[in-house]
Amino acid sequence: MRRPLQAALAVVALLLVTACSGGSTDESEEDWTFTDDMGTKISLEAVPERIVAYKGVAAALADMGLGDRVVGVFGEPANPDPDLGLQSPDLDVDALPDVTGGEYGAVELEELAALEPDLIVTTTYGAGDYWYLSPDVAKRLGGTYDLAAINLEKETVDGVIENSERLALALGADEADFEAGHAALAKAGDVVRDAARAAGDPTIIATSTTPELLYVANPPAYADLTYLSDEIGLDVVRPAAKDLDEGDYWDSVSWEKADAYDADVALWDTRGGDKNLKALEQQPVWNKVRAAQDGAYLPWRFEIAPSAQGYATMLELFAGDLEGLKD
């Protein structure tokens, strides 16, 4: 398939710049350098002013005072239920040009080239992968543009925030712009803590589904679940290490054995709307567990901006969900 004209021109321009500067080894001439969480060193002639970002990262950049740098986004389609999707009070993500392709990991190259990005930013869960960019697409983009990744792999909430803020500071953010988010996060943590005590400190299981399997999340693999366990003090069900699938994110269980785990409250994966909740409700063996018998289901919001404000917003919503258990 032919590369769209704009992308081809961008490649030519990049090669010309490289050729013109190839004889210089003096890094002091470079005006902006940054080494991302994958260890990739990025060197540009100036601080990036035009950024295309994964939607969650775009929201986080806005939370940290850099929303005016974001000229386009890519990532998951909008959640069918906006209340369950990415919450971005500082940026209208849906109003930005969306260069997401027609399938997972794809990008509309011609539309991307038209945005003339200085930098493309997404997240990573390790193994050298750029989130929501297939390996082939990431390789192709890397030949034309500079890519940066924020690590989420087995990080705590504080770790994720630190990774995001490190990039934001390198981009010229004012650290004072982080203060409101940190204050909101501390306050939201207190609200969740109070809500958890009022709800009787329920045991929690975090789940996702496919037609064939129940997936039980491993808390250390998820920053939000680690926070609920370590900072709030909730008992979050943790599969045994020997039962974890490759990557240590889940224990996959056949529906015939879906009552192998028990908990007071079940969190359901909100990606794609309420389809995972409906799947749980329709499984007879699963319906033997306490959470199912009591109808104690709460949304597990997967789409979180990796910023202090992003996690604060998630926790505020979770506190409200916990309080709703008493209704």
Per-range role (PLM):
Residues 46, 106-116, 252-262:
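Short helices/loops that flank or line small-molecule/ion binding pockets
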Residues 57-60, 76-79, 126-129, 153-157, ...:
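Solvent-exposed loop/turn segments at secondary-structure junctions
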